[in-house]
Amino acid sequence: KFVAVDSAATLLNKIILEGSSTKADIILGLDMSLFDVANRSNLFAKHKVGNINKQIRLPIKWDSDKFIPYNYGYFAFVYNNKNLKKPPLSMNELINSTKARIVIQDPRTSTPGLGLLTWMKAIYGDNAGNEWKKLNKKIISVTKGWTDAYYNFFMSGEADIVLSYTTSPAAHIMFENNFDISASIFDEGNYISIEFAGILKTSKNKKIANDFLKFMLSDDFQSVIPSTNIMYPVTNINNLPDAFKNLEI
């Protein structure tokens, strides 16, 4: 049985509130911005999948004996290249130069929204608050989730730029043959997003849960990640759909 909620942050909060009374065996869909909170919650058991770093290929070393990564990507500001001829090429340009209308997601309820907080902090450190004040003048809406921001604001034309992922253009290419959507690759770098899964300590089905985590690293599971979750698989990136091959990152 699968139970879905509208965001990773909501999912983790739900599990924390349920505590030892939760009926969940596995939680999946968390990302790096929630890693520390999940790790400190003391709700997750060590997995029995073996040495993860021998089984996966990530841009960074994976350092956890509780959580299994299953896909990754990078946060980015996405725009229509037919409408926006001079997109921002850095966070500095986005904040200080662009006149474009921007839509982002609420960090309290959205993974990309929380990722942007971390991204800004990584770039600006203690000065992030001042940069946020300047960026806020360009933001026309802060939505609860990604779908509302992307489709109801960006794709409708109400916003020029939306917070999303570097892989978002691949979806438009694969499913619409639309090459008009691009992602800005920033000079400061684009912050990585790794999604992962973990087993709850209270699970009464730990063997089955561990078998499922192993399945998540199998070719059968990983091969459909690019076309379903529009992210990079963690085990083999050599057989990506053509739409992914021209992405900068």
Where are these regions (language model features)?
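A bilobed periplasmic-binding-protein/Venus flytrap-type ligand-binding module shared by bacterial periplasmic
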Residues: 76-83, 121, 193-208, 224-227
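Periplasmic-binding protein-like
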Residues: 56-57, 73, 133-136, 143-144, ...
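A ligand-binding cleft/hinge motif common to bilobed small-molecule-binding domains
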Residues: 33-37, 155, 159-180, 229
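Short beta-strand->loop
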Residues: 45-53, 65-69, 92, 161, ...
